[in-house]
Amino acid sequence: MSRYRGPRIKIIRRLGILPGLTRKIPKKSMKLRSLSLQSKSKKKDSQYRIRLQEKQKLRYHYGLHERQLLKYVRIARKAKGSTGQVLLQLLEMRLDNTIFRLGMAPTIPAARQLVNHGHILVNGRIVNIPSYRCKPQDSITINTRTQTIALIQQNLGTTRKTKLPSHLMLRSTENSATVKQIVSRQSVGLKINELLVVEYYSRQA
């Protein structure tokens, strides 16, 4: 399944607010209609459908292909600790998501573009792989040879009121940041029941 490129408002109307996908919020009338439909179908929802919905939230929020998400689930299953929490850590520590959580980009797709086009350096080297897994003590800076510094500073100004996750440290005046530690469950930027996602993939992973 390819990455979604259709109307994002349709997705958040169905799945709820997904900050990584879009800043848009459904209009009140749309939200009420959606809640009404949800309450009517709540009793009819099968366990499979509930798990599928949680999986879709995760996939659309982080902007992943189905195969990519399944790969992360398989890695999480082999790791020590809670599979669901390890899965969230793997996704949260991706470079594109880290750029988004720092406020350097308004969404994860926008952060992915910054990475793809060579605007981001990790430990002094250009990293153009959005799935790069950030590690504690990684230093993230903006490529001064590009013309995106003004745009990133504008994004930082827009998101200044947003609370920065505890595992990240931002030095906005220096256009740089540091990954202090692995993200905790409390700092994950999405309201999700990861156990349902793991259960969805129980026969595939």
Curated annotation (Swiss-Prot):
GO BP, sorted A to Z: ribosomal small subunit biogenesis; translation
GO MF terms, alphabetically ordered: rRNA binding; structural constituent of ribosome
The record's subcellular locations are: Plastid, Chloroplast
Keywords in alphabetical order: Chloroplast, Plastid, Ribonucleoprotein, Ribosomal protein, RNA-binding, rRNA-binding
Mind telling me which PROSITE patterns this protein's record contains? RIBOSOMAL_S4, S4
Domain named S4 RNA-binding is located at: 93-154
Query: GO CC terms on record?
Result: chloroplast; small ribosomal subunit
- Would the keyword Transmembrane turn up in this protein's UniProt record? no
Asked whether the UniProt record includes Transport among its keywords, one would answer no
Pfam families associated with the record: Ribosomal_S4, S4
Q: How does it assemble?
A: Part of the 30S ribosomal subunit. Contacts protein S5. The interaction surface between S4 and S5 is involved in control of translational fidelity.
Similarity-based family? Belongs to the universal ribosomal protein uS4 family.
The function of this protein is: One of the primary rRNA binding proteins, it binds directly to 16S rRNA where it nucleates assembly of the body of the 30S subunit. With S5 and S12 plays an important role in translational accuracy.
Q: What is this protein called?
A: Small ribosomal subunit protein uS4c
Organism, by scientific name, is Chaetosphaeridium globosum (Charophycean green alga)
Q: Specify the taxonomic lineage.
A: Eukaryota, Viridiplantae, Streptophyta, Coleochaetophyceae, Coleochaetales
